Amino acid sequence: MAGPNGDPHVLGGGTGDEGDEGGDTFEEEEYAAINSMLDQINSCLDHLEEKNDHLHICLKELLESNRQTRLEFQQQSKQLNTGADVQGSQPPA
């Protein structure tokens, strides 16, 4: 049986001419195990991607919330400064 790049797999250093059916079974089991591991890795990566997307959304919401809070704080600060300037320019009673 040829490998993924077309090179023949030779088990046990033989030439592959022995007609060993056990070798094909071993290779199939090996490929099945590798496929299973790749499926698990793929599932883990999908899960990580979902968590990353969720985290990204949460961080964007937090950033927007912080921007809103900062703008509100700046507006309040301006109003207080404007009020203090108006009171400071009036003569004391």
From Swiss-Prot:
Xref: Pfam families: UPF0184 (PF03670)
GO molecular function: molecular adaptor activity
Cell location: Cell junction; Cytoplasm, Cytoskeleton
Stretches of the chain forming a coiled coil according to its record: 59-80
Keywords: Cell junction, Coiled coil, Cytoplasm, Cytoskeleton
Major localization listed first in the record, in broad terms: other
Ranges of Acidic residues composition bias in the record: 17-26
Disulfide bond entries: none
GO cellular component: anchoring junction; cell junction; cytoplasm; cytoskeleton; subapical part of cell
Region (Disordered) residue spans: 1-26, 74-93
GO biological process: intermediate filament bundle assembly
PANTHER family assigned to the protein according to its UniProt record, in alphabetical order: BUBLIN COILED-COIL PROTEIN, UPF0184 PROTEIN C9ORF16
Function recorded in the entry: Essential for intermediate filament organization in intestinal cells, interacts with intermediate filament and regulates intestinal lumen morphology.
Family designation: Belongs to the UPF0184 (EST00098) family.
Protein name: Bublin coiled-coil protein
Gene name for this UniProt entry: BBLN
